Amino acid sequence: MVIRAGCQFFQRVMAMLVITLCLSTAAVANLASPMTDGQHILLMRHADAPGFSDPAGHRLDQCSTQRNLGEFGKKQAERTGQWLSQQGIESAKVFSSPWCRCVDTATLLKKGPVIVDPSLGSFFENMSLANQKTESLRQLVQKSLKQFPKTPIIMVSHHVNIEAFTGVVLGSGDMILVKIGPNGKPISHQVFPGMR
């Protein structure tokens, strides 16, 4: 009796696991479809960059003065690009923050030329810019979706920018597929963990 109840419990757990895996796979397999409907963008936090913040006196025109991708971060960005290809995203309009770790992440995705836009630049060191930067990002998103409605749009930025825009905290290399309303603001989202 105890063995039979244990088997039934195990069968139920396994059935729920299979259903969950199928639903997750279906959600991932359909990534290319929403990204070409003129309503979605894929925001990505730059890949792994060891350390915290940028060194004092860093300059955007000198990567050597910034916190940059480590070897793991470079591989993480490449694996993310391969994963996107498996989801049907072979090319995209790719936008990046001016910070080198973001530009390098965007470049290593290998989805097309990288368009550097200050709207995606970090305000971590000056939080008083949060509203201004978030509004700039909203305008960039709205303009890009109007300009490229049938082209996947990928934007590589920083955790503070993405959190301010979506309300979601992402880890290094994580992505968030965001459905955008007519006003350029997020309606819904789905998070995709970074490649490990």
Segments predicted by a language model, with ranges:
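Generic beta-sheet signal
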Residues: 39-41, 151-157
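Sec/Tat signal peptide C-region and signal peptidase I cleavage site
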Residues: 25-29
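Bacterial N-terminal signal peptides that target proteins for export
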Residues: 2-14
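A short, acidic, amphipathic alpha-helical segment used as a generic capping/interface helix at domain edges
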Residues: 136-146
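Glycine-rich phosphate-binding loop signature in dinucleotide/nucleotide-binding domains
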Residues: 87-89, 144-150
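Short, well-ordered beta-to-alpha junction loops that form the rim of enzyme active sites
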Residues: 96-99, 156-160
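Active-site-proximal alpha-helix that buttresses catalytic centers in soluble enzyme cores
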Residues: 30-118, 123-127, 132, 168-196
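Bacterial N-terminal signal peptides
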Residues: 13-24
